[in-house]
Curated annotation (Swiss-Prot):
Belongs to the UPF0301 (AlgH) family. GO terms for cellular component: cytosol. It comes from Neisseria meningitidis serogroup B (strain ATCC BAA-335 / MC58). InterPro entries: AlgH-like. This is UPF0301 protein NMB1336.
Length: 182
């Protein structure tokens, strides 16, 4: 099972402070573990802070976007999920059209017309060790669904949890993850 380019959707009763009601975009999943970016948890960092550090202007299309808190790991670093893949340093190709890049050069080029079509900027990332995500899935902590670029880039972050559930055709209020456990 490879969940790269999928969303993890936290079950409604997840009690973890960070992951409660999270949607995580899985960027890499292999035998060594998984890496993803939470796409619906805003951070205290602003787009202005990100772009002023590079000396570039915020692109008009991103002025109202929020910087996401991608996860609890390496929160001092920035990560960008973007289209198209491009030729950036420190990139992981997630799909034919989407990459995760952790190098500053992608931020510096976002304001250039045509360099990056769509981008989700985050600080930190989410990580699972070998077998950890599979155990959490077996414990009914998460649902999975193939990723949707519209949810990832176009829907406001506060609506992404409901939109991911809607992609499954499920009302999150009707779920109880303890089903089947005595």
């Amino acid at each position: 099972m490879n969940l790269s380019n999928h969303f993890l959707i936290a079950m409604p009763d997840m009690e973890d402070a960070f992951f409660s009601q999270s949607v995580v975009y899985i960027c890499k999943h292999d035998e060594d573990g998984a890496l993803g970016i939470a796409i619906n948890k805003p951070s205290p960092i602003t787009m202005d802070m990100i772009f002023s550090a590079t000396g570039k202007n915020i692109p008009m299309r991103m002025q109202h976007d929020s910087v996401m808190m991608g996860g609890p790991v390496q929160v001092e670093r920035g990560y960008v999920v973007h289209t198209p893949i491009g030729n950036w340093q420190s990139s992981i190709g997630v799909s034919d059209n989407i990459a995760l890049t952790s190098s500053r050069d992608v931020i510096e080029n976002i304001s250039r017309e045509g360099a990056v079509d769509k981008a989700l900027i985050s600080i930190g990332y989410s990580s699972w060790s070998k077998g950890q995500l599979e155990r959490e899935l077996a414990d009914n902590a998460w649902l999975t669904v193939p990723a949707d670029e519209h949810i990832l880039f176009d829907i406001p972050y506060e609506h992404r949890y409901a939109a991911a559930f809607a992609k499954l055709g499920i009302d999150p209020l009707a779920l109880f993850s303890g089903a089947g456990h005595a």
